[in-house]
Amino acid sequence: MKTGYSKQIQERINGADDGTIFVNSDFADIADSETTRRNLNRLTQIGMLRRILKGVYEKPKYSKLLDEYVAADPDAVAKALARSYHWTIVPCGNTALNLLGLSAQVTAVWSYISDGPYKTYEWNSTKLEFKHRTNKEITGLSYMTSLVIQAPVSYTHLRAHETGR
């Protein structure tokens, strides 16, 4: 028999789209962090969730076309980490260009500027990189405005590299 906490956590996960990324703090309104952690670990063991990183979980998304589960969205994982640590993040470099559709190059490292510390996370073949910037550089602007500001800087570097300048 499920406890009230377990049932509420599971209902929230069931109500989310496949591929949704969760962190422990997403359930702070339901239970304390230890109870949440135990419940998320249990749901991982039964296959309802997939652990991406310590404290970061995904409701797996299955592709009928590929006949397998698809990889976690790195941008969604970055946003979940930012949510968990109360960081403000903005994609930069090739990540910004890709998210705006200005580059078709597959980025090897998903890069973000952040008001948090310099930090790198890796899982499977995916790497997230957070670069510290002062609050004034990234706070107070909408996500899209910040993204648009970051993209031209990256685009200029990309074009210079392509033309050999």
Predicted regions and their residues:
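Basic, helix-initiating cap at the start of DNA-binding domains
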Residues: 1-3
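Short beta-edge/loop segments at beta->alpha junctions of small alpha/beta modules
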Residues: 5-9, 14-80
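Short, hydrophobic/amphipathic alpha-helical patches that form generic packing surfaces
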Residues: 95-98, 143-155
